[in-house]
Amino acid sequence: MTKLTARQQQVFDLIRRAIERSGFPPTRAEIAAELGFSSPNAAEEHLRALARKGVIELAAGASRGIRLLGIEDAPHQFTLPHAGLMQLSLPLVGRVAAGSPILAQEHISQHYACDPALFTSKPDYLLKVRGLSMRDAGILDGDLLAVQKRTEAKDGQIIVARLGDDVTVKRLMRRPGGLELIAENPDYENIFVKAGSAEFALEGIAVGLIRSGEL
């Protein structure tokens, strides 16, 4: 990999850890806060330097539009030939009715054309976030969470799950006897799901986030 300064390596490693932990990269503000920069603008300068060195790619106009480049084991990376020239058409899922598939036609309010560089893996749909239970992971009310359909997920990944009649976004952790769905906000309680519960179904994992107003 291209030789980086110590500070650039810190930024690069932070991006990599964030993608491994949550499925999507940090915002400029999160980088600044984590590494003690004076402002998000300082983080932006380091990101541009990394882009010039060819180790990341920046998507214009997106707070989390950062992709790792030039390493074979980059976590969950989504690559397409000539990705900058292509667009993904993704359905936006609003409220989900009890007992019906999450991608049922009646749940889809519209489709968005999105730059593939916004996501760490190819998403299947966008889910409009409701509430602040994942606030401390940078997921806010009204955000659009990019979701890849999966039937399995790793510990620490942010998932979309069906619990009975509800659909929720939480961080997954395996515990003795079941699963814990962890909220990233101390005002919300975690949810324990017993092993084999018929009430639980994994709908997918988070692979990107679009802040309200970025599309």
Swiss-Prot record:
GO biological process: DNA repair; DNA replication; negative regulation of DNA-templated transcription; proteolysis; SOS response
EC number: 3.4.21.88
Keyword presence, Iron: no
MF (Gene Ontology): DNA binding; serine-type endopeptidase activity
InterPro entries noted in UniProt: LexA, LexA-like, LexA/Signal_pep-like_sf, LexA_DNA-bd_dom, LexA_repressor, Peptidase_S24_LexA, Peptidase_S24_S26A/B/C, WH-like_DNA-bd_sf
Classification via SUPFAM superfamilies: LexA/Signal peptidase (SSF51306), Winged helix' DNA-binding domain (SSF46785)
UniProt-listed CDD domains: S24_LexA-like
Self-association and partners: Homodimer.
UniProt keyword DNA repair, yes or no: yes
Pfam families, per the entry: LexA_DNA_bind, Peptidase_S24
Enzyme class of the recorded protein, top EC level: hydrolase
Active site residues of this protein: S133 (for autocatalytic cleavage activity), K170 (for autocatalytic cleavage activity)
Catalysed transformations (reactions): Hydrolysis of Ala-|-Gly bond in repressor LexA
Function: Represses a number of genes involved in the response to DNA damage (SOS response), including recA and lexA. In the presence of single-stranded DNA, RecA interacts with LexA causing an autocatalytic cleavage which disrupts the DNA-binding part of LexA, leading to derepression of the SOS regulon and eventually DNA repair.
Site (Cleavage): A98, G99
DNA-binding region(s), residue ranges: 28-48
Family statement drawn from the similarity comment of this UniProt entry: Belongs to the peptidase S24 family.
Record protein name field: LexA repressor
Entry keyword set: Autocatalytic cleavage, DNA damage, DNA repair, DNA replication, DNA-binding, Hydrolase, Repressor, SOS response, Transcription, Transcription regulation
Gene3D superfamilies per the UniProt record, alphabetical: Umud Fragment, subunit A, Winged helix-like DNA-binding domain superfamily/Winged helix DNA-binding domain
